[in-house]
Amino acid sequence: MIGIGIDIGSTAAKAAVVDGEGSVAWTCVQPTGFSSVDASERLREALAAAGYDVTGDDVRVVATGYGRVAVPYAHKVVTEITCHGTGAVRLFGDHGTVIDVGGQDTKVIQLKSGRVAKFAMNDKCAAGTGRFLEIMADRLGISQQQMADLARSGEPTKISSMCTVFAESEVISLIGRGEPRENIARGVIDSVVSRVATMAGQAAGAPYYLTGGLCENAYVVERLAALLGSPVTTSPQARFAGAIGAAVRAAALA
């Protein structure tokens, strides 16, 4: 059985295919855009172009994520926590703490013996999410990668507000005072990482695994490891953890 996982997030829509041998055979990521339904259709078209027919007799599809109910061709809908846990087990192992920083929320999942033992989620405030970094990078007139590169050479400038709106006002004030851009970039990233580390530190502890879009930001990984006092492991496929977990579960459907 071929399993296809569709993970419609708030900012990125991802698909993953697990083949009959249980290997991750294909992945794809696209911006979610305005419509989750349109995003799921674009992923279906990408799958078809890659040779995967979602209506095939030997294919099963599981949808997850923020827009999981907007995938009309899914055979089953499964929660984000379950799919991220399953995906993390496939990528990293069956024990540890998974930290997933998404566009609009941050999830911390404790794995024990290959199962989700407990989890915590911050979906009420964007200040500890990828969206916060996106907003601040826009305010600084640079990309998120440029912000990370600048932050390496910056001195820490404290961004104290717990609210994205007020934090943006702080950044505007710092810009107005002539604070070097690299210092502001360092302060912004440290602000996000400290919030994430606080959540993760309340879980079971090491080993730590980072998934989600920020796993591709090496500076974020370094700063998170420094604050946790423990290595943080990631993977080239870590941003697809939810989709991979959904695909694994799809492959197990009868």
Task: Name the predicted role of every residue range.
Residues G20, C28-T32, A50-T82, Q110, ...:
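Short beta-strand-loop/turn "lid" adjacent to the catalytic site in phosphate-handling enzymes
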Residues V54-Y66, Q202-L214, V232-S235:
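Short glycine-rich phosphate-binding loop at a beta-alpha junction
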